[in-house]
Amino acid sequence: KSTLCLALCRFIEPFAGDIAIDGVSILKVGLADLRDRITVVPQDPALFEHTLRFNLDPDGKASDAEIMELIHKAALTNLVQRDPLGLDAMVHVKGGNLSSGEKQLICICRAILRKKKIVVMDEATANIDVQTEKTIHDLIKTEFRSSTVLTVAHRLNT
């Protein structure tokens, strides 16, 4: 399953068969162009030693209002409220000051804010509690309605 995700992003080249997007082989699409169409939410969240705002929106394209609305929808309000710096609170190295579920939620929010055509979710909700997971699945259905979402999961309900 994860190999398919790696091949889709061209981190590895398929040795047989083909992967096509809109009928065009990914091997015929420039690597930068291909990766510009895709966002990945990995099983092991990739976070930066930087502010919460930067981790949510490293491109700096979203307004604070957009970020806060998404934080509310993604059940991350407590994370922002527990630090007086709010969105400017620092995330430690590898998100050491966050729970594994919070890390995954941040990466899901980042993917939503990026608004890419293809979303790869590799065990993206594995560390989120059942109640929040339902909220996130509803959010994913709404926010990615115009995207193709490839989900890799061990649990059937994810």
Where are these regions (language model features)?
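Conserved ABC transporter NBD signature motif
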Residues: G17-V24, L34
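ABC ATPase nucleotide-binding domain helical subdomain, centered on the C-loop/LSGGQ "ABC signature"
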Residues: A20, K28, R53-V93, H137-D138, ...
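Helical segment within the ABC ATPase nucleotide-binding domain
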Residues: E133-R145, N157
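Helix-to-loop junction immediately C-terminal to a conserved catalytic motif
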Residues: L8-C9
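Conserved H-loop
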Residues: S146-A153
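A short, proline-enriched helix->beta-strand linker immediately N-terminal to the Walker B motif
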Residues: L113-K117, S146
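ABC ATPase nucleotide-binding domain "signature" region
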Residues: T3, S99-S100, I106-A111, T135, ...
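Catalytic Walker B motif of ABC-type/P-loop ATPase nucleotide-binding domains
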Residues: V119-E123
